[in-house]
Amino acid sequence: MLCIKKMSFSNSNAQHTGGGGGAAASVASSDSYSGSGSGASGSGSGSDNVLVIKTVQIAPVRTLMCALKEILIETNITFQKDGIRIINMDKSHTMLAHMFLEAVNFELYECALDKIIIGVNMFHLFKLINSIDNDDTLTIYIEKKDYNDGVVSYLGLKFENGDIKQCKTQKLRLIEPDPEDLVEPQVAFSSVINLPSCDFQKIIRDLSCISEKLEIKSVGNELIFRCSGQFATAEVRRVESDGSMEFLHKKDSGKIIQGEFSLKNLGYFIKCTNLCNQIEMYLDNDMPLVVKYYVASLGTIKLCLSPLPSS
């Protein structure tokens, strides 16, 4: 089980937060709204909206939604002045996803309130996002009429394609937000490793054919992936080298760091592969494994997996 309240990830030299995890709080009522002129929804001027976000980075957003729907069935999404946050666990409480997309990285980001929290079925959101074309511009918005004293009933999505002069508008019916207050775990990790995301994907895919469990071990300047199944065993060794694998931080080069993790759950992690070229892996004994992906230039998502019990 993951214990995630009142903590945040870091290596032992510097805090590793990627923007932090906003805790749930009472949202300001619509009385505190001051217009955010953007005209996003096709339903009037910008003053009709409490939230307007615009991006042309369609492929990363689609990839992100595809990965999150496998881990989180339902989740809160928090919109604040500085960006968008998701922090939640899967139903088994063995995986945690923490996403932060910074406001400054969007083509347009206007949040009229200090905090807006919505509850979303991730599969339903993915079904809507998945229909967007890579050439479209995506606008996410919340109309003032759909915001009532901190409760949001609909999330608007607008797809615009200037080449064919087409505008498609959809509104996702929202669910009640989870009242539980989650923040990002704060943990000091002994080892932080940089690895190509496609290499990590291939290792996980290949070893998933052999076993359900994967041992990850850091020894000296080596990173070792090892598994054992009914019909075979396998081992992949990576040595630190320029452009391939690099230890960004290792507290004690002589210390052996290892843990055993579910390959099925790691299979959900590698759905983020196309988001970036390199991942950061955070390792320590008797600690969750954390894999950090960059969501193109929008922000980061950190995926956390608790170790399997010792056999």
Where are these regions (language model features)?
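DNA polymerase sliding clamps and clamp-related checkpoint/processivity subunits
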Residues: L2-K69, I73-C209, E215-S311
